[in-house]
């Protein structure tokens, strides 16, 4: 194995070797992005120069990733992009950018380097068992241990490499805690990163963490606002339901409107009855009296009912009084005499159908055969005979 004269020479040689060939991940990523057959899934960005967009992540992970890598995990692909310095351009879609990842300039991929972590233990795989050489002291005085460690790793790196010292140890208690970072990484066998690259990696991680925290905070605020709005709408809904159930009653019609509607219904039912009364009274041949019916405004239904009962009672009382007491005209007793040729039979109830409560019939007696008999005052009560046709009122 060829030895380097100093650490700077070894680092320069390693950097030159790495620049000659880009990382396989970058080469495969460039190929899958530059493939025109899959532009509907992944393609160059809007500027078609320095960004690329994954339009359909599910299809990208299912159909494209297995063709270039040994997995189909989209999250793992994104993590690899982050380790090589790619950044997400906009949060709305999976668009990534890197200043050296440009269309038609594949040679620039050698300028893209993997970010180095601050501790080699986080980037290295689990170590094999440590077998120290016989001349390598595990426990020494701190000052002597530091000097021997530095001499062993720098002067005799072949022996160290042969024994696998380049791997991290489960319990590295043999190292000095207060040694510089470069010395510790040298003891572990990994290349010591320059301070600028370490600071850049730390700044990149800090920026990514800040962006993620800001996005989480924004989502949390949005979620809180939505929950508050939902609770407010539920409260309004419950208040409306409570108000309708406990404070709203059906509106009853006013008395005037109710009477008007009831009157319309009763008149519609009673008009045929009034027409029948007119027809029956006009066609009667058993009485010479004429019946004249005059329409008057109908009172309310309750008053009509009371008036009907009252008129019925008065008619019964008056007919009974007329049958028991003599008839007088201007203080002169009248004797009933048949009108016309002879006495007429009493009219049957069928000939006089009941009239409607809305109409009050007025009876006008027309009889030409009325006879008056004036008896002397000394004689006992003699009645005047008057011929009149008996009429009945309903």
Curated annotation (Swiss-Prot):
A motif (Nuclear localization signal) lies at residues 269-271. Residues 278-291, 375-394 have a biased composition (Low complexity). GO terms for molecular function: DNA-binding transcription factor activity; sequence-specific DNA binding. Residues 276-394 are annotated as: Disordered. GO terms for biological process: regulation of transcription by RNA polymerase II. Exhibits temperature-dependent phosphorylation. Homotrimer. Transcriptional regulator that specifically binds DNA of heat shock promoter elements (HSE). The hydrophobic-rich region (HR-A/B) corresponds to the oligomerization domain. This is Heat stress transcription factor B-4c. It comes from Oryza sativa subsp. japonica (Rice).
